[in-house]
């Protein structure tokens, strides 16, 4: 009996570990990767993108992300989209929000970006009542 309980406990711990490593992105990941409010000030858009991609830890293990979007709004404006929504629901803001697209222009020797600023509607993916994925932006 004790061996059986130990076996099931080990299986449960393994399942939890795997789900944490390969599971759904978290709200904290979403905020770190896509929300910059209030917008951090830099002398130009290229400097903004180059510093923010490093500061937020978006490029890891020598890999440069080809495109990343930062949304410059209070996170609560995005959180409200996911209230009472099922997991994996995609929701789009009705209003346009300020966003910055950071696009990779060179990957060696270091990641280098250029940027563009827009006012776009923002589509997010929801999980657990919170945004966890930026699905895109639209004029």
From Swiss-Prot:
Its main location: secreted. One of its GO terms (cellular component) is extracellular space. Residues 1-21 form the signal peptide. Belongs to the pancreatic ribonuclease family. Keywords: Angiogenesis, Cytoplasm, Developmental protein, Differentiation, Disulfide bond, Endonuclease, Hydrolase, Nuclease, Nucleus, Protein synthesis inhibitor, Secreted, Signal, Stress response. PROSITE patterns: RNASE_PANCREATIC. Disulfide bonds join 49-102, 64-111, 82-126. Its EC number is 3.1.27.-. It comes from the Eukaryota. Homodimer. Interacts with RNH1; inhibiting ANG ribonuclease activity. The active site is at residues 34, 133. This is Angiogenin. TRNA binds at residues 102, 122. GO terms for biological process: angiogenesis; defense response to Gram-positive bacterium; hematopoietic stem cell proliferation; negative regulation of apoptotic process; negative regulation of translation in response to stress; stress granule assembly. Secreted ribonuclease that can either promote or restrict cell proliferation of target cells, depending on the context. Endocytosed in target cells via its receptor PLXNB2 and translocates to the cytoplasm or nucleus. Under stress conditions, localizes to the cytoplasm and promotes the assembly of stress granules (SGs): specifically cleaves a subset of tRNAs within anticodon loops to produce tRNA-derived stress-induced fragments (tiRNAs), resulting in translation repression and inhibition of cell proliferation. tiRNas also prevent formation of apoptosome, thereby promoting cell survival. The gene is ANG. Coiled coil: none annotated. Gene3D superfamilies: Ribonuclease A-like domain. GO terms for molecular function: endonuclease activity; nucleic acid binding; protein homodimerization activity; RNA nuclease activity; tRNA-specific ribonuclease activity. It is found in: Secreted; Nucleus; Nucleus, Nucleolus; Cytoplasm, Stress granule. SMART domains: RNAse_Pc.
